[in-house]
């Protein structure tokens, strides 16, 4: 059955839909803090999030399937999730495609940024066509999007890179097939993780972290603290091995692990990766 977007809805209904969607995009962090989060890789941000989350860090927020970062040289990306579903194999969606594209672009453009477009490909596990290429990368960059995460494919890789648009995807492909946005502003599942519109996303070559609502504040401070904690305990001990016997080195690392856990526990109530 053809799933309709907003194409047949009156303007008042579309406006109400947009207002409801924007609720999840209420700015929970200043842009300056997002820029600081972007300076750290995603594992570092995960380490901080792990200390403040109320969720199970073994299953919540992270990808559980392999992602490929096709622009690792661009470093991490940070933004608010714009969620979309596509089904490139289904030609039924081409009916009214121009109007559907227009409404979708208007929806995305009116959301606060920076934005990361997260796309669930309903053709999975097959890969029939790509939503992304040179044209869509440039258009989305112009309306405040910094990149995408899709469990489908991307193409025009060099041209997307030239546009400054980062992509984590399942694979590359040649064509676009019958791709149009099918649904948007909806809950989706990509790479084994559920993502809602407006979630804070941090992503790089390691994968992604979709921060649960309400856990954005304190994320940067926790991440910086845990990174410093590593440097001042375990990494310091490991790098200070010259002239030590093997037993002395191992003893020092053991003590550093205890110090690491104690510092984390005193700050967060949890001892972190290397503590008890």
Each predicted region: which residue ranges?
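Low-complexity, intrinsically disordered Ser/Thr/Pro- and acidic-rich segments
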Residues: 2-8
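Intrinsically disordered, low-complexity regions enriched in acidic/Ser/Thr/Pro/Gln residues
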Residues: 9, 17-98, 102-111, 116, ...
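Buried hydrophobic positions in well-ordered alpha/beta secondary-structure cores of metabolic enzymes
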Residues: 49, 140, 199-201
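General beta-strand structural signal in soluble alpha/beta enzymes
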Residues: 60-62, 86, 118-120, 148-152, ...
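Extracellular/luminal Protease-associated
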Residues: 108-151
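A contiguous pocket-lining binding segment that forms or flanks enzyme active sites
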Residues: 150, 157-204, 208
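A hydrophobic, small-residue-rich beta->alpha segment in the mid-to-C-terminal subdomain
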Residues: 200-243
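Charge-patterned, long linear interaction tracts outside catalytic cores
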Residues: 240-276
């Amino acid at each position: 059955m053809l799933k309709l977007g907003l194409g047949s809805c009156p303007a008042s209904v579309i406006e109400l839909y947009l207002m409801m969607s924007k609720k999840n995009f209420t700015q929970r962090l200043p842009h300056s803090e997002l820029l600081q989060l972007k300076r750290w890789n995603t594992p570092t941000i995960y380490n901080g999030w792990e200390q403040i989350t109320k969720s199970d860090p073994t299953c919540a927020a992270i990808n559980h399937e392999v992602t490929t970062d096709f622009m690792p040289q661009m470093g991490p990306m940070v933004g608010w999730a714009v969620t979309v579903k596509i089904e490139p194999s289904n030609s039924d969606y081409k009916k009214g495609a121009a109007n559907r594209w227009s409404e979708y672009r208007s929806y995305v453009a009116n959301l606060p940024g920076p934005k990361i477009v997260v796309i669930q490909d309903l053709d999975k596990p097959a890969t029939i066509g790509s939503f992304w290429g040179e044209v869509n990368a440039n258009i989305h960059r112009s309306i405040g999007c910094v990149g995408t995460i899709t469990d489908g494919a991307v193409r025009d890789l060099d041209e997307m890179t030239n546009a400054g648009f980062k992509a984590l995807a399942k694979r590359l492909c040649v064509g676009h097939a019958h791709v149009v946005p099918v649904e948007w502003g909806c809950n989706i599942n990509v790479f084994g993780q559920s993502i809602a519109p407006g979630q804070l996303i941090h992503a790089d070559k390691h994968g992604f972290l979709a921060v649960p609502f309400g856990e954005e504040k304190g994320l940067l401070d926790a991440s910086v603290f845990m990174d410093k904690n590593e440097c001042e305990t375990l990494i310091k001990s490991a790098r200070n091995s010259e002239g030590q016997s093997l037993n002395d080195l191992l003893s020092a690392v053991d003590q550093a692990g205890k110090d690491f856990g104690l510092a984390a526990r005193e700050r967060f109530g949890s001892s972190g990766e290397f503590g008890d």
